[in-house]
């Protein structure tokens, strides 16, 4: 039995998220269906981070076990031929049998993309959140300082979150402006359900001048979801990287745009 790692890219618009669901089409279902056909046996996969409905990935990491002998090219080109255009395998490699894409991960990186322009873009409309008002990046980054370290993020978790603990460790949270794009990059050991989109929604209020940077600290300490802003839309969020003890994978979405 061999353990294989896949690096996956997908556009999440047409899916209910990563995780297999009985009522809707998921990325996991499409990938397992294609892998199972190539392997001629049932294949189940594990992913580094389960993305929600409409969320994308440039570097999702998946692993699966199979005793079917196939060259690595078959696991990539053969499976890609069976996958829809909005899901593709970028790379494949054999890994140690102890490797688990979810539980071996040290941290995960997400990008949230904002298109900050007076006029919306027909090309990027489904890839970014459009904000026509000017955003104060400096104040947003000041607010990000309050997010760093291990903290209780109850104020930024959804009511449907099933995690046993609201504590998460954020190593990086930063906004970077590149032309008309503003990229929020956040790195953490793990994230709560809707956590990043809830953070973005609140940080936008700071950037628009409705709240001060210190307001984020007040919201955090409240441990109350109703004190934070509304959830930012899903289509601006991308899973872009994972770090493991032996290696890391990262493909920043803005580098694909520019």
Curated annotation (Swiss-Prot):
Function: Formation of pseudouridine at positions 38, 39 and 40 in the anticodon stem and loop of transfer RNAs.
Record-listed substrate binding positions: 110
Recorded name of the encoding gene: truA
Record-listed E.C. numbers: 5.4.99.12
Recorded family membership: Belongs to the tRNA pseudouridine synthase TruA family.
Superkingdom of origin: Bacteria
Family annotation (HAMAP family): TruA
Species of provenance: Francisella tularensis subsp. holarctica (strain FTNF002-00 / FTA)
A molecular function (GO) term: RNA binding
A Pfam family: PseudoU_synth_1
UniProt-recorded name of the protein: tRNA pseudouridine synthase A
